[in-house]
Amino acid sequence: MNIDLNADLGEGCASDSELLTLVSSANIACGFHAGDAQTMLTCVREALKNGVAIGAHPSFPDRDNFGRTAMVLPPETVYAQTLYQIGALGAIVQAQGGVMRHVKPHGMLYNQAAKDPHLAQAIAKAVHDYDPSLILVGLAGSELIRAGERHRLVTRQEVFADRGYQADGSLVPRMQPGALIHDEEQALAQTLDMVQAGRVKSVTGVWTTVTAQTVCIHGDGEYALAFARRLRAAFNARNVHVIA
């Protein structure tokens, strides 16, 4: 059995270099919520050195709140902003002799696109128009995945090791109880359930079916490195191969 293990990087965390030795895919911040041209270049070089698949991590323009502010923007604006960010990272990757593999939206852009078909459509169209061979990463079972499929993009359905789930398969909003899982044992058990059994237990106790093709480890998490090592060991023990 294979699984992709991804992390959001280039967001100002000191653990980026070490995480790149543990994950198979990196989602690199493109300047709208975190990062800048130099951090993008540094992350690209480190990812290439470690053989890690590179992806763009576009966001709403919200550096003050790390891309976590809900916004109501016209789809055409979201299309342009997404295209702009993908293009910026793509230029750096190309200049370093690499190939960009995927796009995964960040924060509130990701969460809103999971439920808003118009927003999802704008993102999927931007990815397709830039390079139809790129993989679109989105929340498992979401509108973003469906929009990607309509544009005939390859999609990857994502699950989260350290986030609580609602009964409908969506993430618990960050400001609500149960949104973040701080206990490593609980996060590990949830991840293994999602990957091996295709199910997740919601915060209300309801089991929900989920498709896990890629697992996200948040690079800004307090215990990201230690948890990544434990998760890799657990996968190895169960003959689950980490591969992009």
Swiss-Prot record:
A GO molecular-function descriptor: 5-oxoprolinase (ATP-hydrolyzing) activity
The EC number(s) this enzyme carries: 3.5.2.9
InterPro entries tied to this protein: Glyco_hydro/deAcase_b/a-brl, LamB/YcsF/PxpA-like
GO biological process, one term: carbohydrate metabolic process
Signal peptide: none
Keywords attached to this entry: ATP-binding, Hydrolase, Nucleotide-binding
Pfam families tied to this protein: LamB_YcsF
Superkingdom in the source lineage: Bacteria
Top-level class of the enzyme under EC nomenclature: hydrolase
Assembly: Forms a complex composed of PxpA, PxpB and PxpC.
NCBIfam families: PRK05406.1-1, PRK05406.1-3, PRK05406.1-4, PRK05406.1-5
Function: Catalyzes the cleavage of 5-oxoproline to form L-glutamate coupled to the hydrolysis of ATP to ADP and inorganic phosphate.
Family statement: Belongs to the LamB/PxpA family.
Protein name per the record: 5-oxoprolinase subunit A
Gene (UniProt): pxpA
